[in-house]
Amino acid sequence: MASSSSSASRTWRYRVFTSFHGSDVRTSFLSHFRKQFNNNGITMFDDQRILRGETISPALTQAIRESRISIVLLSKNYASSGWCLDELLEILKCKDDMGQIVMTVFYGVDPSDVRKQTGEFGIAFNETCACRTEEERQKWSQALNYVGNIAGEHLLNWDNEAKMIEKIARDVSEKLNVTPCRDFDGMVGIEAHLRKIQSLLDLDNDEVKMVAISGPAGIGKSTIGRALHSLLSNRFHHTCFVDNLRGSHPIGLDEYGLKLRLQEQLLSKILNQDGSRICHLGAIKERLCDMKVFIILDDVNDVKQLEALANESNWFGPGSRIIVTTENKELLKQHGINNTYYVGFPSDEEAIKILCRYAFRQSSSRHGFKKLTRSVTELCGKLPLGLRVVGSSLHGKNEEEWEYVIRRLETIIDRDIEQVLRVGYESLHENEQSLFLHIAIFFNYEDGDLVKAMLAENDLDIEHELNILVNKSLIYISTDGRIRMHKLLQLVGRQANQREEPWKRRILIDAQEICHVLENDIGTGAVSGILFDTSGINEVSISNKALRRMCNLRFLSVYKTKHDGYNRMDIPEDMEFPPRLRLLHWDAYPSKCLPLKFRAENLVELDMKDSRLEYLWPGTQLLTKLKKLNLEGSYNLKELPDLSNATNLEMLDLSVCLALAELPSSIKNLHKLDVIYMDLCESLHMIPTNINLASLETMYMTGCPQLKTFPAFSTKIKRLYLVRTGVEEVPASITHCSRLLKIDLSGSRNLKSITHLPSSLQTLDLSSTDIEMIADSCIKDLQRLDHLRLCRCRKLKSLPELPASLRLLTAEDCESLERVTYPLNTPTGQLNFTNCLKLGEEAQRVIIQQSLVKHACFPGSVMPSEFNHRARGNSLKILVKSSASFAFKACVLISPRQLQCERNQRRVKIRCRVTDGRGRFVGSKVVSLEHPNHSTGIRTKHLCFFNGVLTEVSCDALCFVFKISAYNPLDNYEISECAVQILTNEPERRSCDGGSE
């Protein structure tokens, strides 16, 4: 049986094809039939239009295939024509292959005679079959039996032939009206959505099923619902699409009256009876319980709507399907709808296609608009509604006009988009709206626990309110626990905030308005937040009492989107901050310390990035609510305050605090500290010892050259970055760090040896150190070690025995490396010994003997003897026996021809393509030699080895072609020699030829 989607995607030349016996109906019934269809605007194929001289049978066959509906007029002489019977076979074939609709009319003949080929109809059939084969007879007989079972109009059941023709024409019109249309052809991603929803619908199951389509506003739920209605309607007795349910709340109706009105609307639509009136709520069940119906309830926003229209499955006949589209997932739980298709955002590629369809009327951007297209797609957040509306507005616009729209989109949402998205916001209660606004303005992409701490109030169940926003698809919680709101919804929130009356406005975000409020001390208790971008303002002087009247101010964020180096805010040293502050974010804070009267007991986050602070405050503050402390870039900061009470602090950022020399001993109390950033603390030399922070997992201390002692803050630590420090040794106590996964000591030149490592370690980076020795015992037992990086360890002479778990060994530019311990236990690893020019022959043999290694590279110019199939140049042909598969090992000699760039050679790719003797593709392999930062790349001749497998080899010759390309297009390498070793099913004959392409 053809799928409905196949018929939906076809172009039909004719609405109707009629199969008939001419002498029975052409000048009587058929002529009236044609006239009625013409009056109804239904195009029929007319066999009288066939040009003379054209073979009639192929022309009719083509006409059948190009018709949406075929009507078979079965008269007493229909079976006397082999031509008619062949038409019937073609019609039924089109029904199966293309989803063509078949209707029947029994004109002066009994359906039973058609099915059984009896009576006068049977006599005519037997006469036709007399000169035909038994196979033809069987095919015709089966076709007549099938078509005789199709319920159709029977002339004997009608007193008036004209009325019967009107009824047939009306039925055809209805079928054409529900015929899958072309409205959704070419809609990006629609086919994938329809395919997935159809699997949920399980259309072959006779149970009644309710399925939901859920997702945020503007994602395309209604569009998908309409496409489904178009696609599947012809599979049901009655169908209807009930739209605008969100607005179905007539004034003056109680709940019972509302439900009656909704049921009347549904029955009027599905039964095609305008003005249906009912007097009780059992009407839908009474009228539809034995009908197979397909109903789509669009934009449902109240469970009462579902109770009125689809309260129970037994309201509908077997095989019925009810689809509900909604943004509210909680509503679906309340009604017990468990089968839900959640409409996700399109991929980057699909989003660009959607935009281009409307902006350029094609699926890709025009020349010169690629970057602009990506910018618009990003600003629309890949929301289909936004892409459609903005794309349509950009149609025919030049690049300058596109750039104007992009600048506008950063702060203002299109009215048509806002009209749709604002509905969700307006459906919220006051507390929920307040939460929505605060997330939109302050806390999008923030950690959920942090947001709860920021917004928690005694009278507000923040967890419950967040769940409401999630269930209404206004936010979602990412897998890492962050609260995320769509960019366009953020703009909806900002504009909703700005529409409030100034004296009622809860959050101030307009820079000029904020300046006016602060300069004139006219803030009010209604203000809970200030988001102040100082980039575009003139100089503003703030009095010490500017914030005092804002007694409920909890969130203060002062920042610059454009950093020009100028401080435009003049603030007094004794400025009063409201005591209820939970968020204080002030980029480039201009004073040496916070005011003496500053109270921090309610602070959840203190962010003073790039400040001029030398210290925060004297003495000890109550900091039990503080979770984040960010002082990054505070060059002048000399000391931290007493943090004894900051027992809930989770993140501490001291990066680029150039003057900070030591950490306070009170840091030992930070038992919830998860991550600490101290990169580029160039003066830091003293850290507390003998402390064990229970929660610390990650420590960043890159670029702390004065730090000589290995920090031992926590035995629970997972990641430790000590890049370019003055650390001289790794202490034995590190073996107690049983959760440590990664240590990066690269660039720590004082490190000479390493003797102790924890067994949990997965990644170790000792690159650019002066390490001379790695103890055998500390590496070989690391059964989880995955990556070992030793680049530019210029004093390292030998490698210890390595664990079998190792997948990547990078020892590039180890100029003194001579020995590699045998066996090299890396059966499936990648071994990079680029520019290890002193690597001995014995070490090279150890590397070569790793037969299953993913790939390996080291300096050399002589092909190993075990590669018995070899050739000069980059191609090689081998004669083989046919086999199910071949495993092979390849070796290529890489010669640098031209190196323009001495540093940052990040990648060299080697491609191997295998064809048979006739040039047909057999298999391929791509090897990428990743070089670390600041690598000089391959400077001399190198041998590169890699493995491959060829499956289903059914030829007697294989041709290997190798190509090499560099990340930097200015560099030029060549493959001067290549070789292959067959590891299984060794061919009897040697290679025949080779050469360069």
UniProtKB/Swiss-Prot annotation:
TIR-NB-LRR receptor-like protein that confers resistance to the pathogen Leptosphaeria maculans (blackleg disease). It catalyses: NAD(+) + H2O = ADP-D-ribose + nicotinamide + H(+). Gene3D superfamilies: Helical domain of apoptotic protease-activating factors (1.10.8.430), P-loop containing nucleotide triphosphate hydrolases (3.40.50.300), Ribonuclease Inhibitor (3.80.10.10), Toll/interleukin-1 receptor homology (TIR) domain (3.40.50.10140). SUPFAM superfamilies: L domain-like, P-loop containing nucleoside triphosphate hydrolases, Toll/Interleukin receptor TIR domain, Winged helix' DNA-binding domain. It comes from the Eukaryota. The keyword Nucleotide-binding applies. Keywords: ATP-binding, Hydrolase, Leucine-rich repeat, NAD, Nucleotide-binding, Plant defense, Repeat. Its EC number is 3.2.2.6. Signal peptide: none annotated. The active site is at 87. Disruption phenotype: No visible phenotype under normal growth conditions, but mutant plants are susceptible to the pathogen Leptosphaeria maculans. The TIR domain mediates NAD(+) hydrolase (NADase) activity. Self-association of TIR domains is required for NADase activity. One of its GO terms (biological process) is signal transduction. Residues 12-176 form the TIR domain. This is Disease resistance protein RML1A. It holds the Pfam family TIR. GO terms for molecular function: ADP binding; ATP binding; NAD+ nucleosidase activity, cyclic ADP-ribose generating. The keyword Glycosyltransferase does not apply. InterPro entries: Apaf_helical, Disease_R_plants, LRR_dom_sf, NB-ARC, P-loop_NTPase, TIR_dom, Toll_tir_struct_dom_sf, WH_DNA-bd_sf.
